Amino acid sequence: MGNCLHPAELSPSTQNSSQLNSDLWNFSYDGNDSFPDVDYDANLEAAAPCHSCNLLDDSALPFFILVSVLGILASGTVLFMFFRPLFHWQLCPGWPVLAQLAVGSALFSIVVPILAPGLGNTRSSALCSLGYCVWYGSAFAQALLLGCHASLGPKLGAGQVPGLTLGLSVGLWGVAALLTLPITLASGASGGLCTPAYSMELKALQATHAVACLAVFVLLPLGLFGAKGLKKALGMGPGPWMNILWAWFIFWWPHGVVLGLDFLVRSKLLLLSTCLAQQALDLLLNLAEALAILHCVATPLLLALFCHQATRTLLPSLPLPEGWSSHLDTLGSES
């Protein structure tokens, strides 16, 4: 296969066929008629398929494994801190929702090796579909949880609005599961690699998945920023609660944008005139995917930083929950 940089060479059979056609042409038209010269080499170069180098190929396996291990360790540490008895992170506003963010990050970290290239050709389509389901399901759930945490803020405290956290959790994870159905049905194993399937029969599923990613990863954070700015401009209150956790969308926003562009190109709704443009889009797809994968390491760090800042501010002014005062008195008497 050739590409825009290295054209495909003719095989011997193709060369013989071309020579035969040329001989027949010269034999049939041996008169004084003149015909325009045609640059067959230039036409061949233009017709050669455009080929892009995949950054996330077998050589990227160490990257997948390292990110998976670090993500599992970091998410597990954060979950331990959240559920550790009498630990001050439980005073963090909306900590049950934040703990679910760590769960989503851990789930993503676990399935990263399943979708990683270079682990052999033994993976089945069912395993790949499950991997994509958890991959995108955890990401969708984290984005929706962040949106609710930003919108409701301190109201998500477990003791302030009974049942709100549980109801939101079930609803948001359910919505995330529904949003993963298109990519789950439109993915499988090809040549031993887990990959989304692109075909006319699956075009509706591909379009639905692209729209879901665009809505959750791109439009949701833009909507939060817009609501924040609009409420502030109109003096209608503080608006969505802006904090360091919003940096999570930096890891998935490019993925949503580039995935939408790729779907438009595959559907021929957006035409790329040059091979270089197609190669640039493929490169952006790889970079956006790598950035999205890194979120499973960054999310626990963002959670730790947020809870550290929140508890440092709130701890002196908040009344201690039942059981904390006796625990602190015991520590004071021992000292």
Curated annotation (Swiss-Prot):
Question: Which regions of this chain are Extracellular-facing, per the record's topological domains?
Answer: 1-62, 116-128, 187-206, 265-286
Instruction: State the GO CC annotations.
Output: early endosome; membrane; recycling endosome
Which is a GO BP term held by this UniProt record? inflammatory response
Q: Which cysteines are joined by disulfide bonds?
A: C50-C275, C128-C194
How this chain sits in the membrane, per its record, is: Multi-pass membrane protein
Against CDD domains, the record matches this protein to: 7tmA_ACKR1_DARC
Q: Which UniProt keywords apply?
A: Disulfide bond, Endosome, G-protein coupled receptor, Glycoprotein, Membrane, Receptor, Transducer, Transmembrane, Transmembrane helix
Subunit relationships: (Microbial infection) Interacts (via N-terminal extracellular domain) with Plasmodium knowlesi Duffy receptor alpha form (DBPalpha) (via region II).
Protein name per its UniProtKB record: Atypical chemokine receptor 1
Q: Which organism is it from?
A: Macaca mulatta
